[in-house]
Amino acid sequence: MLCVVTSDNSDFRLTAKADIPIGHKVALKALKAGDTVIKYHEDIGKMVGDAEVGGHVHTHNCKTKRW
């Protein structure tokens, strides 16, 4: 997939490791349990499991502050 960094309009390519449903997140870097999850420059939660680059990030491995 083509990823665009909105703050500086740069871009890069990333391969998703699986089909990622709409509304779910894709790990842009390797994430380990305990890491902070950032979305649109905001801290939205903590990882409770690992995700590799291109991995699926959702409730199975991320505990959001929202819930």
From Swiss-Prot:
The keyword Cytoplasm applies. The keyword Methyltransferase does not apply. Its main location: cytoplasm. It is found in: Cytoplasm. GO terms for molecular function: sulfolactate sulfo-lyase activity. Its EC number is 4.4.1.24. Transmembrane segments: none annotated. Keywords: Cytoplasm, Lyase. (2R)-sulfolactate sulfo-lyase is composed of a SuyA and a SuyB subunit. Together with SuyB, desulfonates sulfolactate to pyruvate and sulfite. This is (2R)-sulfolactate sulfo-lyase subunit alpha.
